[in-house]
Amino acid sequence: MIHDERIRSLNTEKPARDGKYVIYWMQASVRAHWNHALEYAIETANSLHKPLIVIFGLTDEFPNANSRHYRFLIEGLRDVGDALMKRGARLVVENERPPSAVMRYSDEASAVVVDRGYLDIQKEWVDELAESLHVPLMQVESNVIVPVETASPKEEYSAGTFRPKITRELERFMVPLKERRLAVDSLDLDPGPDLNDVTGKFRASEELEPSIFSGGASEAIRLFDEFLSEKLACFEKYRNDPVKNCLSNMSPYLHFGHISPLYLAMKASKTGECPEFLEELIVRRELSMNFVHYSDNYSSIRCLPEWAQKTLMEHARDPKEYEYTLREFEEARTHDPYWNAAQKEMVITGKMHGYMRMYWGKKILEWTDHPERAYDIAIYLNDKYEIDGRDPNGFTGVAWCFGKHDRAWAEREIFGKVRYMNDRGLERKFRIGEYVRRVQELEE
């Protein structure tokens, strides 16, 4: 089922009856599996008795993206290209800005369907295309369980204010997505270059070592099945423990749209009680979409609530026992072995344990000469090294370290009223030395 709330008309144009095909502009939901935008595009193509082509614009202009991110993305494109072919739709990848790639094929299109992203650049691309197209542009939301505006009409203060609003919508939106069949396939069309030619020639502006994860829906499904059978039982108890191997590792796949959050939620729910997993997947993740969608400053310290900005600036010049530069942070050259291990884990694997990411961000605030510079450093490092950097979850995670979605605590130096974390807490809660040793083994 595709609820009306997922669908938005972005212009007032009428379908071109003499067009050769319908276009699905795939950008945020790179999958053929449980993808509302794709299924809506198939419905549209069938209603017009047209084939469907799927277009992806592979641009090197995406802010802060590097070879690590593009390698993961391209693996997903190859996976989805094969999956689409089995369903009778051809994937066209053009090495250019996404709206330009779609416009290149729009003269012979009857209609265009696009999925939905929440970052500023994704909104700008869609607005640009909407102003240029002479056929209908429909946007279908598929990367959240509850559509963002349905969950809440405003930016929420915290998980506590957001949770009851999204929870009361879950029963309505937690329904399976039926896979449609294309009436007319596009496999005989030859509208664009070969996928392997385009991806093989693509070069990112910044080279980075690949992460340990491979992209694509097939790999995401395999990892999630492994999580359900081997890790879910310990997730509820040990999800915050960086020593335990209990996480789903779905965040990179959710970021690139290689897996559906609805699919994950419904499959996990069938295995039994998993409230903490659903809390993270639904409440916490979709709170991050709420934040990025409604905030004008989601990548800046100006996104923080007034009390957090005020208290941090009041303590901006407090004396600091340790102070580091961006380069020292990036190279994991601090006095703290736990922080260094977290940074190295991110650099080596492309993913840092969630609990350590909180500690990591708090310490950047504590050891930088000014909170605004600390914020920028945390965003920069997260965006550069995390496979799921440049993502609502990442922006929200950094913001939380500085007071977003949290309350004021007892005032102290440097942090003011922002929540504090220290190494003694790690030592008290976890066998943190084992975490450090495990990261050292990764280095070797």
Curated annotation (Swiss-Prot):
Any GO molecular function: DNA binding
Cofactor notes: Binds 1 FAD. The FAD is in its reduced state. Binds 1 F420 non-covalently per subunit. The F420 is in its oxidized state.
Stored Gene3D superfamilies: 1.25.40.80, DNA Cyclobutane Dipyrimidine Photolyase, subunit A, domain 3, HUPs
Domain named Photolyase/cryptochrome alpha/beta: residues: 20-148
Protein's GO biological process: photoreactive repair
Family note: Belongs to the DNA photolyase class-2 family.
Cofactor(s) needed for function: FAD; coenzyme F420-(gamma-Glu)n
Keyword terms of this UniProt record: Chromophore, DNA damage, DNA repair, DNA-binding, FAD, Flavoprotein, Lyase
Functional description taken from the UniProt entry: Involved in repair of UV radiation-induced DNA damage. Catalyzes the light-dependent monomerization (300-600 nm) of cyclobutyl pyrimidine dimers (in cis-syn configuration), which are formed between adjacent bases on the same DNA strand upon exposure to ultraviolet radiation.
NCBIfam families linked: phr2
Catalytic activity line of the entry: cyclobutadipyrimidine (in DNA) = 2 pyrimidine residues (in DNA)
Signal peptide: none
Organism: Methanothermobacter marburgensis (strain ATCC BAA-927 / DSM 2133 / JCM 14651 / NBRC 100331 / OCM 82 / Marburg)
Keyword Kinase set for record: no
Gene responsible for this protein: phr
Name the record gives this protein: Deoxyribodipyrimidine photo-lyase
Binding-site residues, DNA: R239
EC number(s) on file: 4.1.99.3
